[in-house]
Amino acid sequence: RELRRLHLVEDALERLYNSGRFRLTLAYVLARTGLRPFDLFLMAGEWAEAQGGMQRIGLEAYTACMWTFFRGLKGIEPAGLRDAMACDILHSRRGGFLPACLYREDGRLKKLKRAVAFQAGRGAGGVQRAVVILESRKEKAVVAEYADCDPVTGWYPLELVEVDRLEKSLY
């Protein structure tokens, strides 16, 4: 039984932390819940096993499962969790496409995408960029630039910007 529990912790640790894909999310969850990392990884592993296991699940589906799991923890605010997970995706995955569980419809988004593409000179061989409007701070957006990632973390740089400033940059 103890060996099985350690295996569940190991699997959650590998997917959530060692992969580098959920580091901001983990920092948010640990800060909001007060859980120790070991306890969180054990809970995540046990929860995943109760859902039928996660061995052959893709990253988007795993993200959706962790969204559901983390949201159910005491102290977690869905908007803050969504923002942390969205920033993790922008940091770690070129392209910046959010899974359905994190995507939010916002009429300003199309305009902001045009603005960041224009700023990057994408049509002239420029840098690919992505933008996400924060749910917990609607006047702020995060812009990712997919030129060069950090050689140590593998993360792409993010910039926190004012939505109004970004919208006005088109004019």
What are the residue ranges of the model-derived segments?
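Radical SAM enzyme core and accessory elements
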Residues: A12-Y171
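Acidic/histidine-rich catalytic neighborhood
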Residues: R1
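Conserved, mostly hydrophobic/aromatic
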Residues: L6
